[in-house]
UniProtKB/Swiss-Prot annotation:
Record protein name field: Phenylalanine--tRNA ligase alpha subunit
Subunit structure: Tetramer of two alpha and two beta subunits.
UniProt source species: Bradyrhizobium sp. (strain ORS 278)
Example of a GO cellular component annotation carried by this entry: cytoplasm
Gene encoding the protein: pheS
Swiss-Prot/TrEMBL keywords: Aminoacyl-tRNA synthetase, ATP-binding, Cytoplasm, Ligase, Magnesium, Metal-binding, Nucleotide-binding, Protein biosynthesis
Lineage: Bacteria, Pseudomonadati, Pseudomonadota, Alphaproteobacteria, Hyphomicrobiales
The protein's required cofactors: Mg(2+)
Amino acid sequence: MSDLASLETSILDQIAAAGDEAALEAVRVAALGKKGSISALLATLGKMSPDERKTQGAAINLAKDKVTQALSARRDVLKAAALDARLAAETIDVTLPLQDTPADTGRIHPLSQVMDELTTIFADMGFSIAEGPDVETDDYNFTKLNFPEGHPAREMHDTFFFNPKEDGSRMLLRTHTSPVQVRTMLSQKPPIRVICPGRTYRIDSDATHTPQFHQVEGLVIDKGSHLGHLKWILHEFCKAFFEVDHINMKFRPSFFPFTEPSLEVDIQCRRDKGEIRFGEGEDWLEILGCGMVHPNVLRACGIDPDEYQGFAWGMGIDRIAMLKYGMSDLRQLFEGDVRWLSHYGFKPLEVPTLAGGLST
């Protein structure tokens, strides 16, 4: 009995001294495991006489129960201590400011924002979006758009040409998005109502010009389309884009090879200390070019000009973005300065809508 009491005391002391659950498990295995000390005593009961088995069995089982209870109690203590330590290590200081999420810190580039605004406005008028390749043929970029041979726009100082092919033909980086209009007229039957936003390229670089820039053009082809429709579309666009209730416009005669008649559009504005306010004042600002599609362009695209007529317009997305949001240097749009983008960019979840506001 004295040996059992000593063993029990030793095991209970080891349980109390266990500093973590791993050490406690080692004590349990040493005492109650298959080859444990108490398990070994229980195995000897079969060799005892009935009287000894009765006395020793009760004592050994009592010791086993005490060890089991002690193990359970110590395990609860160690689990609680481990949880307290983890909570202490992962303490959150509720007085610290919340960390910004990517949706809070990220910004939509002004050009992407303006493209979304443009597509929102024209989609509301029933226009669809047409796209085409940046690398174009001379035929689509010039010939089918009524640019005659020898036109200045074909010269190397305006256009990025690739090396000539074996047959002498040359590919180029499109100088406007008008080739998308050509592709649309060749692939679709009238009526047509599309806008063509995208990148364009010309050899030029200063504060108001870059070798790569963005344009959006619009095209309407139908049997009854006329300049009155064009004027209404552009008037409604300018009101919606510049977010004013009223705006005056002037249409001036101009020349573009692909339209006849050709017009340039000025809108009313007021210049005040470097800022431009639209819809008020006595100044005028050129905003875009437009006109009725030239009959030669319609014929080149397989459309009978005696049955259909249409109008088109085009504007620089970079320029109208600068005018609307007060940016002074076009080159900054392409420099990737995070500080600049943080100032001029837009929150990614504020999608422009006509109902909710384009630039809010």
